[in-house]
Design a protein with these regions (language model features):
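Charged, alpha-helix-forming regions
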Residues: 1-164
């Protein structure tokens, strides 16, 4: 995945192919997760899917129940926890880096009330737009805004740990 938002594709699958094969159509909005790739050695790629899509075996889709969860919040929370997800779910051995999917599905992120999820996602969307709009500007300004974005993203997604 080269982008944090999937809004179109270079390749398309016909309705007939979906009907007559094992291809599964993932409805938007959802979240794409890379589960097998050499990039998993250092990065956990996650993207928001804004169009209906299909994937190969190297990716999984997380279909979000919009009555309970804001998909943008889930995307940001997974992105912010990427290194911890890799630490807890990476498969040892093998010729290509991969994640143990059941462990990935068991990974917990803090989930506040839906209106709070939406508020956090709206704030992070604004920071994200600011960083991307500035990308044609001065490199030092870009670096400062990215650092600010990461700081606020991590602060917004920090919650007290639950007592056992």
């Amino acid at each position: 995945m080269r982008s944090s938002k999937i809004q179109n594709s270079m390749m398309n699958v016909t309705d007939r192919a979906v009907r007559e094969s094992n291809v599964k159509l993932i409805e938007a909005p959802s979240i794409a997760l890379v589960v097998r790739s050499s990039i998993l050695q250092h990065t956990f790629p996650v993207a928001q899917i804004d169009v209906d899509a299909t994937f190969n075996q190297d990716m999984k889709a997380l279909v979000v129940d919009s009555d309970r969860f804001e998909h943008r919040y889930i995307y940001y929370a997974l992105s912010a926890n990427g290194q911890e997800i890799l630490r807890q779910t990476s498969k040892q051995g093998g010729s290509v880096n991969s994640l143990v999917v059941p462990r990935l599905m068991d990974f917990e992120i803090p989930v506040p009330a839906l209106d709070e999820q939406q508020r956090i996602a709206d704030l992070l969307d604004r920071f994200d737009a600011l960083v991307n709009d500035i990308s044609s500007g001065l490199p030092s300004e870009i670096a400062a805004r990215r650092a600010q974005y990461e700081h606020y993203r991590d602060r917004l997604l920090s919650f007290p740990e639950k007592k056992a």
